[in-house]
Amino acid sequence: MVDASKKWPKLRPPLSEEQQRISDDFMKHWHEVLPRRYKFVDDFNHRYPVRHAPKEFLRTLEVGAGLGEHLDYERLSTEQTKQYVALEVRSNMAQAIQKRFPNIQVVVGDCQERLPFSDGYFDRVIAVHVLEHLPILPQAIAEAYRVCDKQKGLFSVVIPCEGSLAYTLARRVSAQRHFEKRYRQSYRWFIEREHLNRPEEIITELQRHFTIIHRGFFPIPAPALFCNLCIGLTLRPKAVSEQSA
């Protein structure tokens, strides 16, 4: 049996200056393109956490907030807006969020590191297409668990069906096509460096700290990977004594 602890952190190959520039540019570009060109997918990505939000929540942490696209789907009260924290690791994208949504809190930071919030501070934690990117995934999930309210909090996650037939084919005519047209080079080095974690790995790590209380599959509402593009998960924090090593 493989020791799971030896899988992490996963190592990413270093980037040249040109590759780093392309990586930063495409991440921002794709966050702009996806809502416009592939709205039917983006609707699932962002409606799922809204539909399964805890009742009467106040404080939200969104990790890997991108350009703030998820906020277009929220219907927040004035107080909920003030208590909404968008965490984004790229400063240029964080600046874009703050410009569009000046009334929320925007923090530049890495969800794999300790966050500047007390234990159990948030009623909801959201991660939309984030966990597949993380080389230190267990640490990020443990930190989401730490800041999530253990009594009433929920963790909402959306991940791609990475490796499935449907997802691979869909990517060839969407992100891969855009990337190769824009930069005139192979998409492979970019996506192999970005999508590090498969669904089964992510779910295994989530279940160490959380209990899955709902699953949603898109576009076919059947619990199968090969025919779907995305999975939505709603999770409740386990009691400290219930967590697995």
Across the structure, where does each feature detected by a protein language model lie?
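S-adenosyl-L-methionine-dependent methyltransferase catalytic module, highlighting the catalytic core
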Residues: 3-20, 25-28, 32-36, 113, ...
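Conserved alpha-helix/loop element of class I SAM-dependent methyltransferases that forms part
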Residues: 39-57, 73
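Conserved class I S-adenosyl-L-methionine
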Residues: 57-66
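Residues at the starts of beta-strands that form the adenosine-phosphate
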Residues: 59, 83, 154
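Class I SAM-dependent methyltransferase SAM/SAH-binding core
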Residues: 66-113
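A short acidic, Gly/Pro-enriched loop at the edge of an enzyme's catalytic core
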Residues: 112-124
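A short beta-strand submotif of the Rossmann-like class I SAM-dependent methyltransferase core
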Residues: 124-130
